Amino acid sequence: MSHKIMAINAGSSSLKFQLLDMPQGKLLCQGLIERIGMANAGITLKAQEQKWQQTAPVADHREAVTLLLDMLTGHGIIRSIAEIEGVGHRVAHGGETFKDSARVTDETLAEIERLAELAPLHNPVNLLGINVFRQLLPDVPAVAVFDTAFHQTLNEAAYIYPLPWRYYEEFGIRRYGFHGTSHKYVSATLAEKLGVPLSALRVVSCHLGNGSSLCAIKGGKSVNTSMGFTPQSGVMMGTRSGDIDPSILPWLAQREGKTPQQLNQLLNNESGLLGVSGVSHDYRDVEQAADAGNPRAALALTLFAERIRATIGSYIMQMGGLDALVFTGGIGENSARARAAICQNLQFLGLSVDEAKNQRNATFIQADHALVKVAVINTNEELMIARDVMRIALAETPVAASA
């Protein structure tokens, strides 16, 4: 039986959405409403081979969702909003409470609100999106899908920071990890493509984009991940530094009089590829600058690959070996150069890349003689969200869909 499921990602001034026909995972439409709250909000809707774009005043998220539902019926994608049988919402932070996606109830919403102190930029707007859909589609079941939930299988040695214990007990300061929905999707899809149970695999998943994180997956469970208490930590990213010596921060505060807010701005918005290259946060722009002879751009690319390679190495040691390395995200899926740089000099591990396969973005890019599979898999967090709606709200197990 077919079910129409919506996957929603609400931002502070945007609303991304997909409508999927489940359990087949067929994409019926997708779109984005951006610049919410402004007179020139951008509205994009794609369905099959058709695309509609316009600008219009969109006062708030309620108006955005109303517009979205009107577009679905107005363009004939569905006959009535009654056809929507479930809604899945991406939520940034589930803390230690949510070890899986959860049906939206008053209790669920109260806990998401309580956890907003751990994700003050994201949980409140995620909550806003959920509440608007509850008001406009009160009889449609909803599921909250948490970026952090997949990493709740980490053991204490992986998630505890070596700080005084009371900071964990009182404030919940620990490694949480993010991009969990993406890491879960690509590892499951990898196992499908290999025809091997995920429980039998040791995988390192590399979600590389403007925000990047790595995840060690053993037996289908996350055993380590590079992002920590916040999405700022781990490997170098587009504008985020990743891990640095923490004493740099009080030193800068004393030397330049920087406030905590200014230091946070520096680490999150002025560092990474942008900070080192001085060119851009976009990997493609930095590549072009490096090819034009910019030494700082070349250094930024080297640093990016080195930090990722070092993390991969530590995860291989932790898992006692590696069966597959997976690349996903905007950079991971599209930059053959980044993949080649990251896999450089790893032949001693049985990991090497075939240049021709890599250049054409083949699904498997390892050399014929390589012991370790190297895969390029387009992530599909929306499909993962829709699957969780089916599993939790509609009590059905979705069939596997290819990436």
Swiss-Prot record:
Keyword list, A-Z: ATP-binding, Cytoplasm, Kinase, Nucleotide-binding, Transferase
Catalyses which reaction(s): propanoate + ATP = propanoyl phosphate + ADP
Database matches in InterPro entries: Ac/propionate_kinase, Aliphatic_acid_kin_short-chain, Aliphatic_acid_kinase_CS, ATPase_NBD, Propionate_kinase_PduW
Broad class of the protein's primary localization: cytoplasm
GO biological process: acetate metabolic process; propanediol catabolic process; propionate catabolic process
UniProt GO MF annotations: acetate kinase activity; ATP binding; propionate kinase activity
Origin superkingdom: Bacteria
Function: Works with phosphate acetyltransferase (pta) to capture exogenous propionate and regenerate propionyl-CoA during degradation of 1,2-propanediol (1,2-PD).
Classification via NCBIfam families: ackA (TIGR00016), PRK12397.1 (NF009063)
Family: Belongs to the acetokinase family. PduW subfamily.
Protein's name in the database: Propionate kinase
Gene responsible for this protein: pduW
